[in-house]
Amino acid sequence: MKTIATGLVLCASLLVHSQTPAPKSAPPKTSPAKPSAAAHKAAPGPRPSLLNPASLTARAPADFKAKFSTTAGDFVVEVHREWAPLGADRFYNLVRNGYFTNAAFFRVVPGFVVQFGLSADPAVNKVWDNAKIKDDPVVQSNKPGSLVFATAGPNTRTTQLFINYGDNARLDGMGFAPFGTVIEGMDVVGKIFPGYRESPRQDLITNQGDAYLKANFPKIDKIKLAAILPAVAPAAHPPSGVKPAAKPSPKPAAKPAQH
């Protein structure tokens, strides 16, 4: 069984494996059954914006939160753009445009990481496969609960992410730059189904999407919805040196006239 105790080489191998291309000895593809007209009508396609990665270039706020509603429960992450600006911007655009809807937690290594970020839609995976962003400097450590982009080498970040289960500080020197952290629901993250570990093949998820996972990994946990939480405005305070207006004293109750 692979564990983090095997050292730096294993950690590098595990995370590089996360985005390696399909092996040459891939099994032959089977032709899926054609969906009925009714089923086709009931399954809308992805947002047009998701099919055009170059259009998703919004700058993320300095700090923001995103809520993940999953089949294991809900958790909230808080992102700090100054930690990794390019990673924060990419994550912000993915969440805002519904990229993670129905995406699976396809790699769960207890004590190490839980990984996700391949779309349930093969058409979306195809266009994002080469939408790489440059690396950010690593300014935060890979502590438990930190949110990080997976990579297959320098400047290869696209859409795959992982949450650290353990203290994986050894990943800091490999270029894995945390840009956020789980602030609510880490217990939920810890309950994500680990039974399949690294069995789901990422090349088949990429090419077949959710159909492959449904057919082969029925217990896999998925993201139902990820959304940016609205910013909470701070309570208003009076200007410095200005005292708040005094509340008027209540008037004494009128006494009944004496007879």
Descriptions of predicted regions:
Residues 1-19:
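Sec-dependent N-terminal signal peptides
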